[in-house]
Amino acid sequence: MAQYKGAASEAGRAMQLMKKREKQREQLEQMKLKIAEENVVKANINKKFSAHYDAVEAELKSSTVGLVTLNDMKAKQEALVKEREKQLAKKEQFKDLQLKLEKQRERERKKEQKRKIASLSFNLEEDEECEDEESEEEEEEYVADKEDLPKKKKKKKQQLGKNPDVDTSFLPDRDREEEENRLREELRQEWERKQEKIKSEEIEITFSYWDGSGHRRTVKMKKGNSIQQFLQKALEILRKDFSELRSAGVEQLMYIKEDLIIPHHHSFYDFIVTKARGKSGPLFNFDVHEDVRLLSDASVEKDESHAGKVVLRSWYEKNKHIFPASRWEPYDPEKKWDKYTIR
């Protein structure tokens, strides 16, 4: 005999509708979260730009070795900015591709849901079987999409080609960038080798121990040596002849070159590379000529230089109001001496 199943079928249909509504609510929440994330990304555009230039500045500092000219620094900075912009453009293109793929999957998911809703069955057993089959189909489709994605990309790459008449130098090109990076690295290594060769060259430095009168000595140093290393060697030579230096240390000595007090951490290489100048002569020459202030035309710049003075700091503190110590002032790399002075 046929049995009455009205109540059971109604209950099954109600359960199915509740499940569908719950799924729709979850999808709506996911869409809201996605929109909120996109808004956050748009709001942080300024931060990305600031981070971009901070990264360029950091890269410029780390890749700069020793002192370089202003033109070299500008060229290096422009190259780093261009490279950084190319990297950001690649990232943006990759993000756009991901968003497009997500939107495509979302559209397919919505179509599938509409199809499911339209084909609802009031038979509970049939609904459960359909759900199992559909979930399996979705998983298979998702796996198939992931497998087909590289194939589609390959097909697009095969179909698209570059027009030889169009300038594409502004577009990202992995091969070209790798070649540029390789050349840049070769140039950097070659430049470093040249600088190391310059630093290892020997120079003869004439200096004068100044205690109110001059006592000249000479010493051989390398261009890469620091002022502190030079003073240490000079102190070893002078201790034999001057008793006040026997208990003195390097930190108690000062090096005066062209009326400028040179800090201990600078090297001779720094002044040679930058062609630095002092108040009364060039800082990049360490041999000695006649006093440039006694030549016929002192307004004409020459390469002649004076013997640098090695002075006890205690002597300077006592006599800094008296010539020649009254002319001395700390070396400032930002200050330019366009003309030599005698007062």
Curated annotation (Swiss-Prot):
GO terms for biological process: chromatin organization; mRNA processing; RNA splicing. It comes from the Eukaryota. Residues 125-142 have a biased composition (Acidic residues). Transmembrane segments: none annotated. Residues 1-25, 125-181 are annotated as: Disordered. Residues 172-181 have a biased composition (Basic and acidic residues). It is found in: Nucleus. Signal peptide: none annotated. The keyword Nucleus applies. Keywords: mRNA processing, mRNA splicing, Nucleus. It holds the Pfam family XAP5. Belongs to the FAM50 family. Probably involved in the regulation of pre-mRNA splicing. This is Protein FAM50A-B. It comes from Xenopus laevis.
